[in-house]
């Protein structure tokens, strides 16, 4: 059994690949933490795009997305950014839940599984 770890640190790997499935760690905003949920979501989706490219994949290969929102009042902003970004020909399954995130500045965290 071979597992490939992408961008590992002492705590986690950003992506773990096994049997052509890529399991992503939760992606969170880095540069937009003082901005609204729309901007944070756009940044996080951009980070996901970069990681997908790093493993030779793209958003049309996303199987599922789990989205954690700090406050459901931001659901419309999240959906606006998502709808601008998602591959409308091959949209993944998706769940969105409200959750207390690890950093109080984060409004969104996204976890995906994709093929590669």
From Swiss-Prot:
Extent of the signal sequence: none
PROSITE patterns: UPF0076
Stored CDD domains: YjgF_YER057c_UK114_like_2
Classification via Pfam families: Ribonuc_L-PSP (PF01042)
PANTHER family listed in its UniProt record: PTHR47328, RUTC FAMILY PROTEIN YOAB
UniProt family annotation: Belongs to the RutC family.
Protein name: RutC family protein HI_1627
Lineage: Bacteria, Pseudomonadati, Pseudomonadota, Gammaproteobacteria, Pasteurellales
């Amino acid at each position: 059994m071979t597992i490939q770890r992408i961008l590992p640190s002492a705590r986690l790997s950003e992506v773990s690949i096994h049997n052509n499935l890529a399991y992503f760690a939760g992606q969170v905003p880095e540069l937009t933490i003082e901005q609204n949920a729309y901007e944070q979501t756009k940044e996080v989706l951009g980070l996901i795009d970069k990681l997908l490219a790093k493993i030779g994949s793209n958003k049309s290969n996303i199987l599922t997305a789990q989205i954690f929102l700090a406050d459901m009042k931001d659901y419309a902003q999240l959906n606006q950014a998502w709808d601008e970004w998602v591959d409308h020909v091959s949209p993944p399954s998706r769940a969105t839940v409200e959750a207390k995130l690890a950093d109080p500045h984060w409004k969104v965290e996204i976890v995906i599984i994709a093929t590669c």
